[in-house]
C-alpha cells in the first residue's frame, strides 16, 4: 500500500487506519472533545496519555479495599499493595525488551532518573559534564541540573545540550561522535532519550553505546526510555 494509489493524503491515512490491526484499541480510551462536541485528534501521548476507560474501575477497587481493609490492604486487597509492582513485571519486561528479573516498576520517572544519576554520575574536577539533547523533557532537564549543582558544579558550564544543525530537526549520530572525540575527557555522563519526545527521533542506542565505549572507556551513558514507551 503506497501513497500514489490514493487521490489525497487524507484518503491514504483513512485507508491505513482501516487496515491497522491495533485500531480497535482506540475504543479503550476516553478522548477530550472539541468545542463542537467532536472527539479531538490527540497527539500529546508523549506528554500525558489518554485515560483508559477502565481506569476509574481500577481506582474504585483500590479505594474500596482501602475503606474496607485499611492497613490490611497491603496484603489482603484484591491486588495486594505490598507486591503490587510484581503484577506489572511481565508486561513491562516485554515492552522494553528486557528479562523480567531485570525490571522493577517503582517511583516516578524523575525520582528514578535521580537514582540512576546518583549511581552513575561521579564527577571529578576534570570530568564533570553531562550531555543531553536540546529540548529534552523539562523535568529531565531539572533533574540533570540539580544533580550538577548538588555536586558543586555550575549547570551553565557543566551541561552540554546537543542541538540539530541549523535547518534540521534531528541530531546526527556523527555530531554525537564528534562531541565525544572533542570533549570526551571532560564528559562524565551522556544522558539521551531512546526516542526524543518532541521530534520522535529514534537513536541507534547500540551503535552510540559502542562509540562511547571506543572513545571514552570511563564515560557512562544512560538512556531515558520513557518517551520510547509512551509515544
What do the predicted segments below correspond to?
Residues 1-231:
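Pyridoxal 5′-phosphate
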Amino acid at each position: 500500500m503506497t501513497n500514489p494509489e490514493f487521490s489525497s493524503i487524507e484518503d491514504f491515512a483513512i485507508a491505513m487506519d482501516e487496515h491497522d490491526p491495533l485500531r480497535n484499541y482506540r475504543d479503550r480510551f476516553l478522548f477530550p472533545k472539541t468545542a463542537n462536541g467532536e472527539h479531538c485528534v490527540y497527539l500529546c501521548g508523549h506528554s500525558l496519555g489518554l485515560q483508559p476507560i477502565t481506569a476509574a474501575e481500577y481506582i474504585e477497587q483500590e479505594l474500596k479495599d482501602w475503606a474496607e481493609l485499611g492497613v490490611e490492604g497491603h496484603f489482603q486487597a484484591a491486588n495486594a499493595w505490598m507486591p503490587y509492582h510484581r503484577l506489572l513485571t511481565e508486561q513491562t519486561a516485554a515492552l522494553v525488551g528486557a528479562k523480567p528479573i531485570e525490571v522493577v516498576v517503582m517511583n516516578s520517572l524523575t525520582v528514578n532518573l535521580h537514582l540512576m544519576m546518583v549511581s552513575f554520575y561521579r564527577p571529578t574536577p576534570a570530568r564533570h559534564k553531562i550531555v543531553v539533547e536540546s529540548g529534552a523533557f523539562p523535568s529531565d532537564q531539572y533533574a540533570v541540573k540539580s544533580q550538577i549543582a548538588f555536586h558543586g558544579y555550575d549547570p551553565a558550564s557543566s551541561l552540554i545540550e546537543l542541538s540539530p544543525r541549523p535547518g534540521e530537526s534531528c541530531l546526527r549520530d556523527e555530531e554525537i561522535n564528534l562531541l565525544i572525540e572533542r570533549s570526551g575527557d571532560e564528559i562524565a555522563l551522556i544522558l539521551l532519550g531512546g526516542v526524543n519526545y518532541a521530534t520522535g527521533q529514534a537513536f541507534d542506542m547500540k551503535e552510540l553505546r559502542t562509540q562511547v565505549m571506543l572513545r571514552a572507556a570511563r564515560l557512562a551513558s544512560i538512556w531515558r526510555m520513557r518517551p520510547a514507551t509512551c509515544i
